């Protein structure tokens, strides 16, 4: 199963919850052109195995795929006798939801492998307990996320978006981004009702102008190289540049047909350390 990355086109922090999480309102968009691959099969001899290739990842309980498999087996009273093969291409701890996407794929593949499709409705609760982004990846289509991000409403987006994703090569923990989130005084996101209207009727340029992320201000302060990347992307014609999720990956919304040239320009300046992906949302 191919497991897509995502961006958060819009992310607004509404407040902190008693459980330590934050209430947010976000717009999830899946992207085509950057994904991992997850295969789940019965293990022979019986036992549980996780094999990772591609980008380095732990193949133990620190891996969300492992935890998803254990949670599934416990919930459905199944002995964990499976082999998971994970080919990792989405950058890790990057704000692109790669681990969450992989975990959702494990849940879905186990459901099919164990012929439990009639109980698919039970996956949402499992997914939400594992991570706030994982429910989105059970059915990765444009959506509004509320609560911790796990309460989803379908969303139609009028214009497909041509994007560059630029990952600077270092991770940023989700916890750090939320702990240090601070919106500059006087800055406000667009009213959500207006954002919905733009997403459903607006042009690519109007959608780009409505993008927002409350987490990015702290990330830009902490890592000046990201501000340099952002400035260069804007100088070379990007319509907007924002941090995706908790970062540090940047997404640049491009004029239609311009992403290849922009990728070439940015690779010439920053390609020695940054990974650049040309994708669509």
State what each model feature region is.
Residues 66-81, 108, 209-228:
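A short, flexible low-complexity segment enriched in Lys/Arg and Gly/Pro that occurs
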Residues 1-94, 111-112, 116-124, 148, ...:
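ATP-binding N-lobe of GHMP and related small-molecule kinases
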Residues 81, 103, 107-144:
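Contiguous, small/hydrophobic- and glycine-enriched helical/loop subdomains that border
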Residues 44-58, 106, 128, 201-212:
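Short, basic/glycine-rich phosphate-binding loops at helix/coil junctions
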Residues 85-114, 132, 239-251:
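Glycine/serine-rich anion-binding loops at beta->alpha junctions
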Residues 139, 143-240, 257, 264, ...:
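Conserved, helical-rich catalytic subdomain that frames metal- and/or nucleotide-binding sites
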Residues 9, 38, 65, 99, ...:
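Residue-level signal for inorganic ion chemistry
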Residues 30-32, 128-129, 135-138, 154-159, ...:
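Solvent-exposed alpha-helices and their adjacent loops that cap or buttress functional pockets
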